[in-house]
Amino acid sequence: MELDYLAQHLVELKNEYLSELHSHNHIREFIPVANHQNLFDKGLLEKLHTFFKYNKIYYKQQGLTLSNIPCISYEGGVNQFWVSSKKYETIYQPFLPTWGLSALVMILVAKDLGFENIIDIGSGDGRLIFCGSILGLNSIGVEIDKDLCDLQNKISNSSNVKYEVINGDSNSIDYSQFKLENTIIFISALPDSGEILSYGMLNHLKKYKAKLHNVGITLMGSHAYRRYSRDKSKWGWGKFIDDSGLKILKCISLPSSWTLDEKKETPYLFTLFKC
């Protein structure tokens, strides 16, 4: 299925989901039952359900039907991780997960663009690298919060989906350890809060410029700008994109916990370093 159409269909299902499910839990999302849909590969969805099964963030699930597609709704909370994150001075944005289906679509986009490796900066509970692994990409997550790293490893061991988890600060780790070719780097932070993180990572990558063969960055943008936002171009990332020498390959808007109750979704910008 064409990925832009898939993303739009996911947004339509999300809107129906929010109108059908009356819940006070901010962490809530759905996954279609694998055998009763034709949107995603059956095996991928079965694996994605195991991610939620072994993820202690989610403590409630129930069945519902969206556009004649049987689905499972998963609800939970991240308060314990918000409290835990206060231990770290260099956390610029609290953990709030990307939707599982959105993560799957993003990895499908990355694969369609020809990337073979992913590095997720601020990998949270590991859903992006989980999806990367089940789609055959070499997947590495960098997360400063040890509790979230422990959760990622538990999910990996329980589901038998393998990926690498690095517990560390993205501004101080050694980037020479990574395979910096055919690699897409995800920055899981909104424009205003992710600026320091992004420029810090960029300074490290500049040291290995000769190795950056087909390397890109995926940025989480915003359709809505705050009154005092420093950058109101290119979904909040215009200056960083220009300073970094990046070109935009694709922008796709997908549901996330950040925009759950808003009319517009979260735009994800897939970019590539210019030669």
Residue ranges and their predicted role:
Residues 182-198:
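A short SAM/SAH-binding and catalytic strip from SAM-dependent methyltransferases
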Residues 196-265:
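C-terminal substrate-binding/active-site "lid" region of AdoMet-derived donor-dependent transferases
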Residues 2-113, 153-179:
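S-adenosyl-L-methionine
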Residues 127-137:
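Conserved SAM-binding loop of SAM-dependent methyltransferases across substrates and taxa
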Residues 114-124:
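Conserved class I S-adenosyl-L-methionine
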Residues 149-150:
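Short alpha-helix immediately C-terminal to the canonical SAM-binding loop
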Residues 138-143:
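Conserved SAM-binding motif I beta-strand of class I
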